[in-house]
Regions:
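Enriched for short, Lys/Arg-rich terminal
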Residues: 1-11, 15-19, 23-26, 30, ...
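A short, surface-exposed loop/turn module that caps and links secondary-structure elements
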Residues: 34-58
Length: 91
């Protein structure tokens, strides 16, 4: 039986989502739910990050980026940050 990954949001990611325009946050939430929640390979939709974000993955949704950590042992995708592409990597 193949494992399907569950999507979880950190407190910071939920704060980021609430700061965004309502229409943008709905698009991001819907995309994550459709493509990542319950999928068998969350790495297929994203790109691995390097340097100080090594071990993290990013998903491109329009001009916004979702930074995640994929935890294979717990079979979850933990959303860490959500933001505009011009500011998401400044943190």
């Amino acid at each position: 039986m193949k494992k399907s990954y569950k999507l979880e949001y950190s407190k910071g990611a939920l704060k980021d989502l609430l700061k965004l325009d309502n229409s943008v946050s709905r698009v991001i939430y819907a995309w994550m739910k459709k493509n990542i929640d319950g999928c068998e390979n969350p790495r297929a939709h994203g790109k691995g990050l390097a340097s100080n974000r090594s071990g993290q993955w990013r998903y491109r949704i329009g001009n916004y980026r979702v930074i995640c950590k994929i935890e294979d042992d717990r079979v979850i995708v933990l959303v860490l940050n959500i933001g505009h592409r011009s500011k998401i990597y400044d943190e």
